[in-house]
Amino acid sequence: CKETTKMRESKITRDEAFELLKKYNKDPFHIRHALTVEGVMRWYAKELGYADEEEYWGIVGLLHDIDFELYPEEHCKKAPELLKAGGVGDDMIYSICSHGYGICVDVEPVHEMEKVLFASDELTGLIWSAALMRPSKSVMDMEVSSLKKKFKDKKFAAGCSRDVIRTGAERLGWELEKLFEQTILAMRSCESDVNSFMGTYQA
């Protein structure tokens, strides 16, 4: 059920957030990941009853890895400085940094939105890697059973932490299968838009 605590509104627009992202990220892989997580977060906002906060959720997803390309060793630690300089509010900075909880920072995901980001971030990478192995190169025809096999194969997309994904599902109170199913649907919702943008993207 939806939490009763009112979520904050973003202090920057989506366009401003994207310009901020591009200021520190040029690699097409990182841009694609940011856009994918943005789309996933927007889908989850609507799915979980936070449609009025879709923009906020999306911007959190868009900016969640803002410091990773230039400062990989300081991930989620350098982010507050970059975000604050870009006009991002403290609440959003907290939410963004919370996806590194227990990995690189001690900022705990508390709100449902933060738990969704924590759970889905690594998983989108695993799903994307699995999609590239398919003839279609797409999530549109991906089934949960196929993803489960890839999840169990620790050598596949080894950089995507299974432990983080499991912990994320537990924090949400979901079974892994539900997280897989929902995140596949979320990625289907934005795949076309992300592909269209990346087809014309130039760093």
Question: Language-model features: where?
Answer:
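Short, Lys/Arg-enriched N-terminal segments with co-localized hydrophobic residues
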Residues: 1-6
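Acidic/His-rich, divalent-metal-binding segments that scaffold phosphate/diphosphate chemistry
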Residues: 7-71
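Conserved active-site and cofactor/substrate-binding residues in soluble primary-metabolism enzymes
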Residues: 12, 16, 32-36, 74, ...
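Predominant activation on well-ordered alpha-helical scaffold segments within soluble catalytic domains
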Residues: 18, 22, 35-42, 77-80, ...
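Short polybasic/polar patches that bind polyanions
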Residues: 22, 42, 46, 84, ...
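Charged/polar positions within long, soluble alpha-helices
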Residues: 46, 128-131, 192, 196-199
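Divalent metal-dependent catalytic cores for phosphoryl transfer on phosphate-bearing substrates
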Residues: 50-156, 166
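A structured, mid-to-C-terminal "fold-capping" secondary-structure block
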Residues: 142, 146-203
